């Protein structure tokens, strides 16, 4: 009986590997991200896929299998988008699934060049697979206006020690390391079975390389993150008004919204208060083109005794040729509206504008956008004047914190900290807010700047330069508090290697992938290669 079972397993190994690939890879991939946050799942989510790949399936099979797995996993991850659009959710999941398929086929090609039984045959393909994952993630940041939501590195936001090297390499390094570890573990499991009765059973260069790499990037900056020299920066009152999305643009609720902002803001008056922060587009009118709205906001800033950083629509131009912007303004006590303001640079396609509107006018009937919002042109910093110094606020609006380059540009301009004004009310009580917050953790570490996030509901809190959440409000309720923001004085006025040099590691991965393609056949045992 035992012999028959063993023979059945031997005869059906590839089918079992294929079944486990479908069952476990999407399950572990989804589980490693917020809101589930089983971050350890990121260490093994590709193991079933890598084991199945060892059976040399056809490229066609690899493409359709990985596309289906990617589509399934991403449908679950962005299911919250159905609150806005079912069709958009399904289509977007398919697009990201296609990126996963692109990576899978490229990886299969790498391994096809290293067939045989050489001890080192899997090293180059494993490195190449990790490099290709970074390349595809980077492409996802730019193709079709970009959707870099949940890079693999975002799975580790609850383990900041793993992320610290992002200040040098960008968060790409963590994605690289996790994919390399997955293939190292898979190689070790395959070797345990394939070399069960030989001395080579415990010898697995891929696994040792991956483990060494993980340890290196985790501990290379441990001393820096543990030797912090924190100093008080400023006190910020944060307002989370929890305005239902169906009320935000309904003029019948205008007075109610303004009254909410008043009674949430005014009680925060204190001699030690330095600033008040409101979420994205919280005001019902464009503040820079509305005299009564400006007067109201100025009275409120004067009443609380601190400048208010307010998310609101901005408007420029003359009647009949108005230009609309999604902006962050500063309203000062007594003085009123500060003339400079930040406008969102990376807009949401089909949410804030219709791409190539003139080519498909029928799209206006599908997407109810009367006019396009225009993008801002630069990372306009706003001053925060304190008693003995002045800070510079780098603003990011909505999902702009998912784009590493926007945070980098603000810090290169001299931002002392990053302010993310957002609104997750579109997506209901879902995992969207927790997923969104994960990107702010990555931006904080990459730039070594504190990140203050203020949402209409969702997640409001602040994150230090090392990715640790220092304080936060409960989500999906109306709330307000005062955060005492501190900073590590060692990074004041300084730029990280990543801020200075950008995505240099991505270009290194392009070189590494090409190199691995070239050397993959070299370590194959020519006597056993097929």
Tell me the role of every PLM-derived stretch.
Residues 2-224, 429, 443, 455-466, ...:
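Membrane-embedded alpha-helical bundles of multi-pass enzymes
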Residues 224-501:
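Soluble catalytic domains of enzymes that build or remodel membrane lipids, polysaccharides, and related
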